[in-house]
Amino acid sequence: MKLPAAAGDAIVIGPNAVRLIKSWGEQLCEEIEPHLSNATHAEMLDHHDRFIVRHELAGRGKGWFTNRGRLISILYEHARKLGIDIRLGSRVTKYWEEDGRAGVIVNDRERLAADCVICADGVHSAARAWLTGQVDTQQHSGWANFRAHMTTEQLAKDPEASWVLQGTREKDRVYVWFGDGINLAIMTMKRGQELAWALMHTDKFNAHESWAGGRASIDDALATLSPWPGRLRPSSVIRHTLPEKLVDHALIYRPPLDTWVSAGGRVMLIGDAAHPYFPVVGQGGSQAIEDGVVVATALELAGKENVPLALRIRATLTEENNVLMEAGNSRYPRATVIQLGSSTLQEHLFWPDWEAVAKDPSVFAFPNPEWILGHDCREYTHQVFDTVVRAVRGEGEYIPRNIPADGAYRVEDTYSPE
């Protein structure tokens, strides 16, 4: 089974995760870099297509913006070169945890056992239901997001649409339009060779929470923009989208879980399975990468011989059988603050206070929080590992230093790249 290299639309990887990927090797980064957008700013416009302000993108040029499928394909090939056993098309049909081991049943037939199981099975996680014993607590937000990716050959030939490629041979462009309950972003990549767009709207078309597609219509996307007096320019671009490349993705809110770690301490949720975000916060992929690195670092610090074998996390605790609990405890506050913040930011941007915007266009500025973008989760895990282990054993207190002191997410401009 081969991954489709250009599947999906686009993904943002923040500087906090880019630093981690860069640590995996120079050759890997050389493969990724030709596919990135080199845009550094975005033009903010209203629904009349009137210019509001030009803002610097989140990450101050240290983050990545690229095609989702291509990035995943490159990372997949990198993992294969490392000799990692990846089995595409293998469906996990059951999870188990018993007698000092944990594992999965694949395709209702093959039983696999391991020291621990890390579950990264996304927003529809079967592992989450097994681990928590809860039915999915999803709540439809009422929002959906048309999303698409395209190459730009046809745009260049269309006099009405070619405006979006002006200047992109030197610098990619980002345009963001705001209207009441509607938000549109158009972003070029690879010096104008590719383009992605995303149209946030109230869900009137029975959108699905799936990247595999479902019913999505270009006509519906264009109709969503029909009330805008300034729809001509963005519509000229959207209409070139191939139907098979369009997704209308429902935005589903899921409240934070009580825990990501199983009672036996051998099974853990990470990524969207643990803490799904709204895309507006631009940290979904980055926080998933942080999850993986923190778990790997915690396992490395404990050593294979110290991964829990018989004792349960909630029984007599020692450092050995706290390794996944340590990873969960150090990650949970940080990921949860960002998860809750994504909901707040969603409302803030999609029902703008136009009087406030007229007085201060910075209300549309991209979040640039130092505590998110400047964070080195690997170094932090080394620093707090022993403290968190002692806290789990009841021998002290762990006070997170990777979130704001009051635990509140704010739109702030505090990030200073190294």
Curated annotation (Swiss-Prot):
> What processes in GO biological process is this protein linked to?
fumiquinazoline C biosynthetic process
What compartments host this protein? Answer: Cytoplasm
The family database entries (InterPro entries) matched by this protein are listed as: FAD-bd, FAD-dep_Monooxygenase_BioMet, FAD/NAD-bd_sf
* Function summary: FAD-dependent monooxygenase; part of the gene cluster that mediates the biosynthesis of the antitumor fumiquinazolines that confer a dual-usage capability to defend against phagocytes in the environment and animal hosts. The simplest member is fumiquinazoline F (FQF) with a 6-6-6 tricyclic core derived from anthranilic acid (Ant), tryptophan (Trp), and alanine (Ala). The trimodular NRPS fmqA is responsible for FQF formation.
Transmembrane stretches, start-end: none
Which organism is this entry from?
A: Aspergillus fumigatus (strain ATCC MYA-4609 / CBS 101355 / FGSC A1100 / Af293) (Neosartorya fumigata)
Instruction: Give the protein name, as stated in the record.
Output: FAD-dependent monooxygenase fmqB
Residues bound to FAD are V12, R68, D272, G285
Q: Which UniProt keywords apply?
A: Cytoplasm, FAD, Flavoprotein, Monooxygenase, Oxidoreductase
The enzyme's E.C. designation = 1.-.-.-
Question: GO terms for molecular function, please?
Answer: FAD binding; monooxygenase activity
Name any one Pfam family assigned in the record.
Answer: FAD_binding_3
Q: Which family does the record assign?
A: Belongs to the paxM FAD-dependent monooxygenase family.
Q: What is annotated as the active site?
A: R147
Tell me what induces its expression.
Expression is positively regulated by brlA, a conidiation-specific transcription factor involved in the early stage of asexual development and necessary for conidiophore formation. Expression is also induced by the cell wall integrity (CWI) signaling pathway that includes the mitogen-activated protein kinase mpkA and the transcription factor rlmA. Expression is negatively regulated by the transcription factor sebA.
Q: What pathway or pathways are given for this protein in its record?
A: Alkaloid biosynthesis
User: Where does it sit, as one GO cellular component term?
Assistant: cytoplasm
